[in-house]
């Protein structure tokens, strides 16, 4: 080795050491931040919500699991109770059953949550519904239904719980949005509109909550291998019932749940959890919108031909 190499080598080792120490301290802070925190998760009975329940339970949080199915929530609580984890003190989860699209039910649910736990430290707005259809064939009632579940529901629950967070000078609001909160793709109009609205609301909320030391994290995943597309609604409100190829090849909910856990522990403001192509599309939409629009027009034409064939 020459003298230059010998000079760089200690600097490289030192940099690696400092970075490793930083990551270790970050993990320790994350663990302390999550231990015994009251965490509310909506849409907890399936998919990403279910996996989030597992990883946050394992982290020693006090869970409040929310969903429409009492049976589904009971099955999840039983599954959690059978987990064997030695690294954290575990707490039996609470269950709150309600329909997120019913604003009156949301307000009652928020009161029930606060009655059960006394406070909410972390709210994870996860519940949602997907959509497939053409704009021309989609009833306005379907647009409203998707907006009620994906936008107005999380907004109502967040607004109902924020006052208690402000009172305690502690809180963290998380929303599981989508890459489609950043870009719009053909035949997803109602879904993408709801996620764009979600992105905008929680971006505003982040700024307005900063004086109260309340964190806001927006997670924008790409395709996740769940039943979201199977349970999607179509333009007339019927069930789509098809597992899209992109969804089938997406990230596992376990992987995304771990990413959400880290994002919360690190108190990230925003996180894009997507592959190379969707990530590039997000930047292309901003930096070269004309090219992006051309790609989307070509995609719409291709998908329309496939449906007509």
UniProtKB/Swiss-Prot annotation:
<protein>
    <recommendedName>
        <fullName>Dehydrogenase/reductase SDR family member 7B</fullName>
        <ecNumber>1.1.-.-</ecNumber>
    </recommendedName>
</protein>
<keyword id="KW-0735">Signal-anchor</keyword>
<feature type="transmembrane region" description="Helical; Signal-anchor for type II membrane protein">
    <location>
        <begin position="5"/>
        <end position="25"/>
    </location>
</feature>
<keyword id="KW-0521">NADP</keyword>
<feature type="binding site">
    <location>
        <position position="195"/>
    </location>
    <ligand>
        <name>NAD(+)</name>
    </ligand>
</feature>
<keyword id="KW-1133">Transmembrane helix</keyword>
<dbReference type="InterPro" id="IPR020904">
    <property type="entry name" value="Sc_DH/Rdtase_CS"/>
</dbReference>
<dbReference type="InterPro" id="IPR002347">
    <property type="entry name" value="SDR_fam"/>
</dbReference>
<dbReference type="InterPro" id="IPR036291">
    <property type="entry name" value="NAD(P)-bd_dom_sf"/>
</dbReference>
<comment type="similarity">
    <text>Belongs to the short-chain dehydrogenases/reductases (SDR) family.</text>
</comment>
<dbReference type="GO" id="GO:0016491">
    <property type="term" value="F:oxidoreductase activity"/>
</dbReference>
<dbReference type="Pfam" id="PF00106">
    <property type="entry name" value="adh_short"/>
</dbReference>
<feature type="active site" description="Proton acceptor">
    <location>
        <position position="191"/>
    </location>
</feature>
<feature type="topological domain" description="Lumenal">
    <location>
        <begin position="26"/>
        <end position="272"/>
    </location>
</feature>
<keyword id="KW-0560">Oxidoreductase</keyword>
<feature type="binding site">
    <location>
        <position position="178"/>
    </location>
    <ligand>
        <name>substrate</name>
    </ligand>
</feature>
<feature type="binding site">
    <location>
        <position position="191"/>
    </location>
    <ligand>
        <name>NAD(+)</name>
    </ligand>
</feature>
<feature type="binding site">
    <location>
        <position position="46"/>
    </location>
    <ligand>
        <name>NAD(+)</name>
    </ligand>
</feature>
<keyword id="KW-0812">Transmembrane</keyword>
<keyword id="KW-0472">Membrane</keyword>
<keyword id="KW-0520">NAD</keyword>
<dbReference type="GO" id="GO:0005789">
    <property type="term" value="C:endoplasmic reticulum membrane"/>
</dbReference>
<keyword id="KW-0256">Endoplasmic reticulum</keyword>
<feature type="binding site">
    <location>
        <position position="48"/>
    </location>
    <ligand>
        <name>NAD(+)</name>
    </ligand>
</feature>
<comment type="function">
    <text>Putative oxidoreductase.</text>
</comment>
<feature type="topological domain" description="Cytoplasmic">
    <location>
        <begin position="1"/>
        <end position="4"/>
    </location>
</feature>
<feature type="binding site">
    <location>
        <position position="226"/>
    </location>
    <ligand>
        <name>NAD(+)</name>
    </ligand>
</feature>
């Amino acid at each position: 080795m020459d003298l230059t190499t010998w000079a760089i080598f200690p600097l490289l080792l030192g940099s690696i050491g400092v970075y490793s120490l930083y990551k270790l301290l970050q993990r320790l802070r994350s663990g302390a931040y999550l231990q015994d925190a009251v965490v509310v998760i909506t849409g907890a009975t399936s998919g990403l919500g279910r996996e989030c329940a597992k990883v946050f339970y394992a982290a020693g949080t006090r869970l409040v699991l929310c969903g429409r199915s009492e049976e589904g929530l009971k099955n999840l609580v039983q599954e959690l109770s059978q987990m064997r984890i030695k690294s954290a003190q575990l707490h039996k989860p609470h269950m709150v059953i309600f329909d997120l699209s019913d604003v009156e039910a949301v307000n009652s649910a928020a009161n029930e949550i606060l009655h059960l736990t006394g406070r909410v430290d972390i709210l994870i707005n996860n519940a949602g519904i997907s959509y497939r259809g053409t704009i021309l064939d989609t009833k306005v009632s379907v647009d409203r239904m998707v907006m009620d579940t994906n936008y107005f529901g999380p907004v109502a629950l967040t607004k109902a719980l924020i006052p208690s967070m402000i009172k305690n000078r502690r809180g963290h609001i998380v929303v599981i949005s989508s890459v489609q909160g950043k870009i719009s793709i053909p035949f997803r109009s109602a879904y993408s509109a709801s996620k764009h609205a979600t992105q905008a609301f929680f971006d505003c909320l982040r700024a307005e909550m900063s004086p109260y030391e309340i964190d806001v994290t927006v997670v924008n995943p790409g395709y996740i291998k769940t039943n979201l597309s199977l349970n999607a609604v179509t333009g007339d409100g019927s069930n789509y019932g098809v597992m899209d190829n992109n969804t089938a090849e997406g990230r596992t909910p376990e992987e995304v749940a771990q990413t959400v856990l880290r994002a919360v522990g690190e108190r990230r403001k925003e996180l894009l959890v997507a592959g190379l192509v969707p990530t590039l599309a997000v930047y292309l939409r901003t930096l070269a919108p004309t090219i992006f629009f051309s790609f989307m027009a070509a995609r719409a034409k291709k998908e329309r031909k496939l449906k007509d064939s």
